[in-house]
Every structure is written in structure tokens, then in C-alpha cells.
Amino acid sequence: MENRWQVMIVWQVDRMRIKTWNSLVKHHMYVSRKARNWFYRHHYESNNPKISSEVHIPLGEAKLVITTYWGLTTGERAWHLGHGVSIEWRQRSYRTQIDPDLADQLIHLYYFDCFAESAIRKAILGQIVSPRCEYPTGHNKVGSLQYLALSTLIKSKPRRPPLPSVRKLAEDRWNNSQKTRDHKGNHIMNGH
């Protein structure tokens, strides 16, 4: 029997980012209970030896499955370790892969309170509005002028620990240049 290949998009990430993602997911599943409907599958519960974990996020009738991998073929650079993540949207027998931004938007649609566009009308009418968006990574566009004014008026506090963001998990850190802080100009010219 011949080999059957299946091609899928796997976002290359480092091991520590996957570890942080898994611990944030578990924290919000079991401690804060904001993601209590999510399901975490360990590596030993999978038939595929390359899968290190799976997070199943119900979205109505569909679900989002974020799968992390280990032991993959390394990338073009030495620090491209063999870890990755795939993001899949499933509904019954239909499956498709999506990008991290869309995954964050879908999570935002179904979970976590938001200071939404409707808050503008509610605030004008004198009704109580949700004070802040709990999941700002789910927004990918700039809001209206009124929305921006209200969101700057109501400052959001940084959440500890932060909510798990798929965009942050799959962020491309490999091809970004290193940024140094507090080094103005050439260090040779500064006398160091």
C-alpha cells in the first residue's frame, strides 16, 4: 500500500510558548472558570506520536481545535526547534484550517465579556455598559471614533494571568530582528 500524504499548515513556535499556552488554558479552565467548556487532551490520549496536546473549544455547533506538535523536522535555522501548532475549525464531518487572527475572533464571539459597539448606544441612553473588553486580541480592526473615545475613557487593566491568545501562540518571532533597549547610537561612539 502506498503512503498517503496529508498537507496541513503548522505554525512554527518555540517550546516555551506552547508551555505558556497550555498553562494559561488550564488556568482559565479550572481556576478562573472562564473557559470551563473547553476540553484539554494530553499527548498520551492521542494516537499520533507527534501531537503534544489538543485544546477543543466549542463554538456553538462547531468547535475549534488547537493542536500542538513536537518532534517535527526542524526549520532552516538552528533555533527553529521541532515544535508547532495547527488551528482547525470543525463542524460535523467538515474541517478547515484557519489562521490565528480568525481563531481569536471566533473565541471572542463565544467567550469573554466585551465592551462592544453596542456600548456606545447604551452609554448615550444612560444604561449600564460592560466596563472593558476581556479579550482585546479578538479585535482586528479599529473601531468607530465614538468607540475609541469610550475605550480610552475606560482604561482596561492588564489581566493576570492573561487570557490565552491563539495569535500570540502562533506569533512569528523567528524572522523578526532583535530589538535592543536603551542603546542609542553606536556603542563604540558612546565610550563603552
Swiss-Prot record:
Region (Multimerization) location: 151-164
Annotated region (SOCS box-like) at: 151-180
Q: Where is this site: Cleavage in virion (by viral protease)?
A: L150, S151
Instruction: State the residue spans of region: Interaction with host APOBEC3G.
Output: 40-44
Would the keyword Metal-binding be found if you checked this record's keyword annotation?
A: yes
PTM (free text): Processed in virion by the viral protease.
Chief location bin: host cell
Residues of the signal peptide:
none
Q: What subcellular compartments does it reside in? A: Host cytoplasm; Host cell membrane; Virion
- Lineage, top-rank taxon, reads Viruses
Phosphoserine found at: S144, S165
Topology in the lipid bilayer is annotated as: Peripheral membrane protein
In chain numbering, motif BC-box-like motif lies across 144-153
Q: Name one Pfam family in it.
A: Vif
List the GO terms this entry assigns under cellular component, sorted alphabetically.
host cell cytoplasm; host cell plasma membrane; membrane; virion component
Annotated spans, Membrane association: 171-172
Q: Where is this region: Interaction with host APOBEC3F and APOBEC3G?
A: 54-72
Kindly list the GO molecular function terms attached to this UniProt entry: metal ion binding; RNA binding
**Miscellaneous section:** Vif-defective viruses show catastrophic failure in reverse transcription due to APOBEC-induced mutations that initiate a DNA base repair pathway and compromise the structural integrity of the ssDNA. In the absence of Vif, the virion is morphologically abnormal. HIV-1 lineages are divided in three main groups, M (for Major), O (for Outlier), and N (for New, or Non-M, Non-O). The vast majority of strains found worldwide belong to the group M. Group O seems to be endemic to and largely confined to Cameroon and neighboring countries in West Central Africa, where these viruses represent a small minority of HIV-1 strains. The group N is represented by a limited number of isolates from Cameroonian persons. The group M is further subdivided in 9 clades or subtypes (A to D, F to H, J and K).
Outline what the protein does: Counteracts the innate antiviral activity of host APOBEC3F and APOBEC3G by promoting their ubiquitination and degradation. Acts as a substrate recognition component of an E3 ubiquitin-protein ligase complex: mechanistically, Vif hijacks a host cullin-5-RING E3 ubiquitin-protein ligase complex (ECS complex) and the transcription coactivator CBFB/CBF-beta to form an active E3 ubiquitin-protein ligase complex that targets APOBEC3G and APOBEC3F for polyubiquitination, leading to their degradation by the proteasome.
**Domain comment?**
The BC-like-box motif mediates the interaction with elongin BC complex.
**UniProt family annotation:** Belongs to the primate lentivirus group Vif protein family.
Q: What is this protein called?
A: Virion infectivity factor
